Design a protein with these regions (language model features):
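Histone-fold recognition with a strong bias for associated Lys/Arg-rich disordered tails
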Residues: 1-141
Length: 141
């Protein structure tokens, strides 16, 4: 992955990106890719903490069979990391962390990622609200 960005990947984000990249060739649909990202994200960084606080588990709470959506074209892991770096730079963040990976995933996968999160127990909106609450609490401490 390209390391020429002003904001380096945090350790958690680097791990999520690497694990996500290894899973993409085996995921034939956008839904399967979103599942892989969720399972990896929920274990790492601020996003993982927020997902666990919301009760987002490894397995889906219910299984629904939506029509398959083709995966994004190209090297999706590279696209996710590149967009995450751009978003972190716009925010003038010191690092590209799992929060920016999540924002990039939501942008690239759109409704597919939101639907996958809902099947695990929380919407993207709820997850972003929880992350905001965690950031506010950290600033107040």
């Amino acid at each position: 992955m390209n390391d020429t960005y002003a904001t380096p990947l945090s350790q958690d984000a680097a791990l999520v990106a690497a694990l996500g990249a290894t899973a993409m060739p085996f995921s034939r649909t956008a839904q399967a890719q979103a599942e892989s990202w969720i399972r990896t994200l929920r274990l790492h960084g601020r996003v993982g903490s927020a997902m666990q606080a919301l009760g987002i588990g490894e397995e889906q709470l219910r299984v629904e069979h939506d029509d398959p959506v083709p995966p994004p074209e190209g090297d999706v892991a590279e696209r996710v990391v590149a967009l995450a770096h751009e978003l972190a730079e716009i925010d003038r963040s010191n690092s590209t962390n799992t929060y920016y990976l999540l924002l990039a995933l939501l942008k690239i996968y759109g409704d597919v990622m939101d639907r996958a999160l809902e099947l695990h127990g929380a919407s993207a909106k709820e997850l972003l609200q929880r992350l905001d609450e965690m950031a506010e609490h950290a600033e107040a401490s």
